[in-house]
Structure formats: C-alpha cells, structure tokens
Amino acid sequence: MNKLENPSQRDVAGPSPRHKTTQVMVGSIAVGGGAPIVVQSMTNTDTADVEGTIAQVAALSRAGSEMVRITVDRDEAAAAVPHIRDGLRKRGIATPLIGDFHYIGHKLLADHPACAEALDKYRINPGNVGFKDKRDKQFTDIVEMAIKYGKAVRIGANWGSLDQELLTHLMEENANSAAPLEARAVTREAMVQSALLSAKRAEEIGLPKNRMILSAKVSAVQDLIAVYQTLASRSDYAIHLGLTEAGMGSKGIVASSAALGILLQQGIGDTIRISLTPEPGGDRTREVQVAQELLQTMGFRTFVPLVAACPGCGRTTSTTFQELARSIQDFIRDEMPGWKTQYPGVEQLNVAVMGCIVNGPGESKHADIGISLPGTGEAPAAPVFVDGKKFRTLRGPAIAQDFKALVIDYIDQRYGSGGKTPTDATTAAAE
C-alpha cells in the first residue's frame, strides 16, 4: 500500500479540538462554549472624557473589536459610563462595554448604580480588589453587584499585581518541600490558583459559572503558555487570552502572536486581546487588526479579504506590485464596514498581487482574483486570473487602477444580489 493510503499517514494538519468551556454572554456576544473566538480591545482615553471615549470606542468597534474595555478608576469615570453607553447607542453602536476595576471597584459600583447597569461585564483583579481582612468583603461586594444586575465578570489575575499573600504562602510551602520548584514555577502556580480560588469564591457567593471568564496574564511568552495550559487543564471556565505588557511595534506583535498562536493551536482561548503599546500618535485600532489577522491566518475566523503578495527580489526592482498590494489591502479594510452588509461572504475573498513571472501566474490562479505584474526586463503586461483562469491582460500606465476596478467588479458580481462572477458575465472580454 502506498504511504499516502495508510490511514496513519493521513493529513492531520489543523488545531486541536477547542477546549470545552462554559459559554458566557457578554451583552449580545457569546464567549466560550464553542462560540467563535472573540476579539476585544481597550480604550486609552480618560473615561471621564465622554466624547473622546465614545469616539475611540466607535473607532475600535468599526475596526472589528467585538467588546471594548474602559477604565473605571474614580467617581468621574463611573458617572460618565452611562453617558458613553447612550452616546454609542445614538450612533447605532451596541458593542458591549467592560468596566476595568482596581482597588475601589466595589465602592464605585455601589455609589454609581447607573454605571453598574450600563456595563456589560466587570473586570476584577484578585490581586488588588482589597487587602487582608478587606479583600473578601470587597470581592463579595463586586460579585453581588454583578449578580444584582445580571452582569458577567472576568476574574483577571496579572503577575504584575499578584496576590502577595497567596504567593508568600506558596513560596513558603515550596521551600519546605522535599523537591522544591524554581521560584518562577511557584509564581505560575500562584497565578493559576489566584484565578481559580477567586472563581470558586464567586460561585459560593452565587455567581454562576456561565457568568465568569478567567484570565491569567504574564509578560513572558513561555510562562504565559504554561500558565494557560495549567488553567485550562483544571477548569472549564471560559478563557480570555492576552500577553500583558507585550510592548511596542513589531516586538509586541511577534510576542503576542507567538504566545497566543500556540495556545489557540492547542484549542485554548475563547476571547483574545493583543495588548500593543501604541506609537506616539499611533492608531489604537492596530491591536484589533493584529488580533483579527492572527485568527484569520490560523484559520479560526474570517474578517476581511486576504491579499497575498510576494516579498520581492532582484526580479522585482519596480515598487509597482508593492504599492498595488498596499493600495488594495487598505481599500478593502476601509470598505469592509459597508461591505459586511452589502456583500455577505466577501470576507472570504482571496486576492493575489504578484511581482514577476516566476510564481506570479501560479499564485494568482490559486486566488479568487489575482494579477501577475511584470518583473524587471519582462514584457510590460500583467495577466489577471479569475477563479483559476486567465481572464484579461492589463497594459499601460493605469494597470493598478484597472486591477482595482476589476476587484470591485468581481466583488459586486460574486457577492452582490446577482451572485455571478466576472467569468460568468464577461468571459468574452478575456484574452
């Protein structure tokens, strides 16, 4: 029997089955329980600035953030929350809002019931909800508010604000062990226990499992992977993934993608945030785009049409293909908010923009619509392929504009009400 016919040799590429978790509703968004992995983000505005926060939540929502977290750190911020919610609704935006509470969340929720009602989820950090004898009461107060208003809660441990009493206890216990672990391993265990013990306490107070999401964030990739693997192995709570303090630019993107990519491949994670430090004056929505691209490139979800483009080499000294690839990608992202309703299914479109004859025609044939631009020294002609077949050859100085027009035409005919493709309608025009 040929090796390819051996059942044990069959293609097993793909992620592990999703870790089974209890589904939680955050507003209208389902998290866990087999629901699609949810993208979320966080504002960096002063929440007391109602108009500024509305504008940023709206921008994050348009970019694709399905939930947005806002800081609630003082009375002015708490008082602003219902106005932010109302302002978003006037704009037709129903994106769930998550209140991020530290230190005095119990007091803010009690003093501002309109805030408690307006939020869709409360985030509690068990490391700073209170200290010593105050901890249990203040934690209980927040959980009881969530029960009263029917809200979900994320219990989010973070090793930058880890419960020091728990950590000290585990360190002392480890020191007296016959085979003590490294301090780093004990810290990871403290992270997991902090989340799980807090969740157990919340259940004892009366908050059901289907209202709780857990997270345990660290800033080191290998530690994050280990912490979440342990957390998933010990519970079936819905899980929020994120690498804290990931950093700026490419470093933050690479670190977050490396950590979350491994966990997602193992079936762990129900909602994710890519925590990027924005460049001065940078676009906050970048973290949403990266989260979407991570999920889409791994095959978990589709958000926008993908544009494949070659990296370039000595055969492509012209920048035309690079400029066209960027132009098409930017155009698609800008148009997606309207296309989602106008062209259902358009997010599954694949476009190829290639730079020379070596791989250009082949890659273009694999895409729904693709173009192979001429490389250095090649004839000034660019064949266009539609659904795997040569459709037309573009020439002249307006190749980029002509190809964009063909992409628009393809989308309209394939995903519009007619459901046709350019090859159906205009095959006679092809060479």
Curated annotation (Swiss-Prot):
HAMAP family: IspG. Pathway: Isoprenoid biosynthesis; isopentenyl diphosphate biosynthesis via DXP pathway; isopentenyl diphosphate from 1-deoxy-D-xylulose 5-phosphate: step 5/6. Binds 1 [4Fe-4S] cluster. Residues 1-21 are annotated as: Disordered. It comes from Nitrobacter hamburgensis (strain DSM 10229 / NCIMB 13809 / X14). Converts 2C-methyl-D-erythritol 2,4-cyclodiphosphate (ME-2,4cPP) into 1-hydroxy-2-methyl-2-(E)-butenyl 4-diphosphate. It catalyses: (2E)-4-hydroxy-3-methylbut-2-enyl diphosphate + oxidized [flavodoxin] + H2O + 2 H(+) = 2-C-methyl-D-erythritol 2,4-cyclic diphosphate + reduced [flavodoxin]. Coiled coil: none annotated. This is 4-hydroxy-3-methylbut-2-en-1-yl diphosphate synthase (flavodoxin). Its EC number is 1.17.7.3. Pfam families: GcpE (PF04551). The keyword Oxidoreductase applies. [4Fe-4S] cluster binds at C310, C313, C356, E363. GO terms for biological process: isopentenyl diphosphate biosynthetic process, methylerythritol 4-phosphate pathway; terpenoid biosynthetic process. GO terms for molecular function: 4 iron, 4 sulfur cluster binding; 4-hydroxy-3-methylbut-2-en-1-yl diphosphate synthase activity (ferredoxin); 4-hydroxy-3-methylbut-2-enyl-diphosphate synthase activity (flavodoxin); iron ion binding. Belongs to the IspG family. Its cofactor is [4Fe-4S] cluster. Disulfide bonds: none annotated. SUPFAM superfamilies: Nitrite and sulphite reductase 4Fe-4S domain-like. NCBIfam families: ispG_gcpE, PRK00366.1.
